[in-house]
Amino acid sequence: MAGFSDIGVFLGYLEWLKVDFYTSRPRRMQESVLKGIVKRNKNTEFGKKIGLGTVKSVEDFQKNMPFTTYEDYDEYVERMQKGEKNLIIKRKPVRYCSSSGSVGKPKIMPKCGEDLWIMQCMGFSGTTGCAAKWFRKRGVKFPKQVGNVAVVLTGHKLADGKMCNGAGQIPIAYLKPISRFFLTTPNDFMYPVDEASVNTSYFHLRFALQRRDLTYLGAMVITLLTTMFDYFEQNWEMLCDDIEKGTIDPSVKCPEELRRKWEKKLKPMPERAAEIRRECEKGFDTPIVPRIWPKFLWSYGMVGSNLKFYVDKLRKHIGDAPIHNMGYAAAEGYMAIPVELNAMDYVLLPQSVFFEFIPVDNPDCDRPLTIDEIEEGKAYELVVTNRSGLCRYRIEDVVRVTGKYKNTPKVEFLYRNNLAMNIANEKTTTQMVDWAAGETQKELGISFKGYSFCDDHDSDPVRYMLLAEPEGDADRSMLPLIEEKLDHYLCESNEKYFKYRRWGMLGAPKVLFLKKDTYADYREMLKNQGKVLNQIKPVTVINNEERKEFFFSHIDE
C-alpha cells in the first residue's frame, strides 16, 4: 500500500503534466484566465465601478481598465471582514493572506478557493514533483520522504472569523491532518497556540535529530534553515543530552502542559544521541547534515537573488545537496515555479493570474506587454489580475526574463520598486525605515540632519545599521537608547521584521554617528561630479560601493 509520501510524489508528477500543458500554450491560457475573472467579478461593487463588464478581450481590458494599488481595495477588504458580500469578488473568501509592504499593519488580501488551490498544488505537489523528476533524471530513486520544515504555522482570525496567514504558510497549513506522515515536528510545535511561548529552533531540531532516516529539510524562506543550524552549533550538547535521556531541557521555552505531555512520550535514545554527539565533536568545518542524516537528499525554501548570501551559509551545513527554490509567490498569487533544483529562476504560471509587464526601460509605454510579448534579457515591472478581486494590481516587483520553458517565459526576481532593504527576506521599505527613524527621533526628542541605512552581513545574525548625522553635538550616551527605540519601531512598522527578530534571524540594529556636515559634503561631491542638485534624492539606503566608501569614511569616531 502506498504511503502518503508516495502519493505526494504521484501528485507531483501529475502537477507537472499540467504545468507542461499550460506552459505550452501561455497566450490561450491567459485569455481563458482573464475571461473567467471578468465573468466572475464583473457584477461586484468594484467591478461595476471600473466597468469590468464591458471587457470583451485582452485589448479591451488593457485599454479601459485602470491600474490599481492596495489603497483601491483597503476599504473593501475592511467591509468584507465585517460581513459584506460581493464587493471585489462574487464568492465569499475562503481565507485571507497577509502581505508585507505597508507601515503599521500588513496588507490583507482575500483569497478565493481557486487561488488557494493553485497555491496548494504548486507549493506542495509542484515542489515534490520537481524534486522527484530531478533525481529520476540522474538515476536516483526518490525514497519515502520524511523531513523537517523549519517554520511555525500560526495565523490569526479576522473579524469575519476567517483565518489570515502569510502566503507561504498556506500549502503546509492545509496538510495539518496528515503532516505527521512526512514531517518530523509534531503538530503541537508546528501549529502552536502561542508561537512566542515555544522555542521553535529547539523543537524542530529535537524531533528531526531523532530520525536517522530524514531525507529533506525545508522552510518557507531559506534563512529559517540557516538560523536553525546556527542554534544547533551553539546547543548541540544540550540537544544530545535530551535525546539520550528522553527529556526537554528546563531552559527551553515551552508551555508547561506541552512539556509534561511530551516528556511522557519521549523515550531515551542513547545510541542515536551518541552517534550525533560523535559527529558534532568532530566540528562543523565539513557539512554536518550528511554525517548525521545519511539518507538526506535535498532542501527547499524561497531563495531569491537577494538571499544568495544565505545559500552559502546553508551549504556549510548541507554540502552540495540540491536546493529547490520553491517558487515566486506572494499574497497576490502563486506566480512562478522553478523547473529544476538549484535554479534561481522560475517559469511563469499562465493558469495562475493574468500577467502584464511594464518595461523598466520604457515605463510610459502605450500599454504593458502580455506574456507572449516579453523578451529575454529585459526587465519588467509586474502587474497582476487574479481571481480574488485584484485588477491590474501593481505589486511593484521587477523581474528579468531569463529564457523559456516550453513556450512560457522564465523570470528571475530582481527587486521591488519601493524596496529599501531585504537582508532577511522581510521586505523593509523606505517608507518603513523613514517612519521608524522619525518615530525614534520624536519619542527621544532628538533630531538628525540626515540618516542612511545599510545592511550588515558581518554581524551574526545579520542586522541593519543606521548612520545618522545629529543636529548639534553628538551625545554618545544616547546610542543604546536610540538603538532600542529604532528596533521597537522597525518591529512595529513591519510584521515580518518583528517575527524575524523574535526568531533570531535578524539582530538588533546598530547606530553610528556621522561627522558634522557629512550630508553637505556628500551633496558637494555629487555636484562636483556634474549632478543636478535638485535631482539628488535623500540617501535613505547605502546600496552601492561609492556610497558605502563615502559614508563609512565619515563615521564620527
Regions found by a protein language model. Give the residues of each.
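Short secondary-structure capping/junction motifs at helix and strand boundaries
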Residues: 47, 107-110, 132-148, 238-242, ...
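Long, hydrophobic, well-ordered secondary-structure blocks that form the structural core
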Residues: 110, 115-122, 323, 331
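Active-site diphosphate/adenylate-binding microenvironment
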Residues: 32-96, 108, 118, 126-140, ...
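Short acidic, glycine/Ser/Thr-rich loop/turn "cap" segments at secondary-structure junctions
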Residues: 81-85, 104-113, 186-189, 210-213
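Active-site glycine/GP-rich loop and adjacent strand/helix microenvironment
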Residues: 1-53, 61-65, 76, 157, ...
